[in-house]
Swiss-Prot record:
Similarity section: Belongs to the universal ribosomal protein uS15 family.
Upper taxonomic lineage: Eukaryota, Viridiplantae, Streptophyta, Embryophyta, Tracheophyta
GO cellular component, one term: cytosolic small ribosomal subunit
Keyword Membrane: no
Name this polypeptide is given: Small ribosomal subunit protein uS15z
GO MF term set: structural constituent of ribosome
SMART domains: Ribosomal_S13_N, Ribosomal_S15
Any Gene Ontology biological process: translation
Alphabetically ordered keywords of this record: Ribonucleoprotein, Ribosomal protein
């Protein structure tokens, strides 16, 4: 299946480990992993950033194989989950950056077009998250208040 607004096919992906169980060389307990996830979330890191730090610095290849649940589910259990889903947050952040660029460069027609594409992705994703009840049904993306969502 192709990408939404580009020519790419999206074939490349990271290789998941074959075994779903925790590695034998890993001596970290699930409670330690939970505590470190909560510690990183309180610092303001996103779930994907937490996963990268745990993989690179702490030697935990996959949180789900150690704890039995994913990072976002652990954050929800402790009440630390972000109010806006991460992918929607990054799209809003990108739209705010493009709007800021367009304030300085009014004649940049390509950026205007890209802003339309990004905002259509935001609306499509918001519709999905409202349907799956990850966003409240009255939530609405507005370009005027978007910078307060990201700040």
């Amino acid at each position: 299946m192709g990408r939404m607004h580009s020519r790419g096919k999206g074939i490349s992906a990271s290789a998941l480990p074959y075994k779903r169980s925790s590695p034998s060389w890993l001596k970290t307990t699930p409670q330690d992993v939970d505590e470190s996830i909560c510690k990183f979330a309180k610092k303001g890191l996103t779930p994907s950033q937490i996963g990268v730090i745990l993989r690179d610095s702490h030697g935990i290849p996959q949180v789900k194989s150690v704890t039995g649940s994913k990072i976002l589910r652990i954050l929800k259990a402790h009440g630390l989950a972000p109010e806006i889903p991460e992918d929607l947050y990054h799209l809003i952040k990108k739209a705010v950056a493009i709007r800021k660029h367009l304030e300085r460069n009014r004649k940049d027609k390509d950026s205007k077009f890209r802003l339309i594409l990004v905002e259509s992705r935001i609306h499509r994703l918001a519709r999905y998250y409202k349907k799956t009840k990850k966003l409240p049904p009255v939530w609405k993306y507005e370009s005027t208040t978007a910078s307060t969502l990201v700040a």
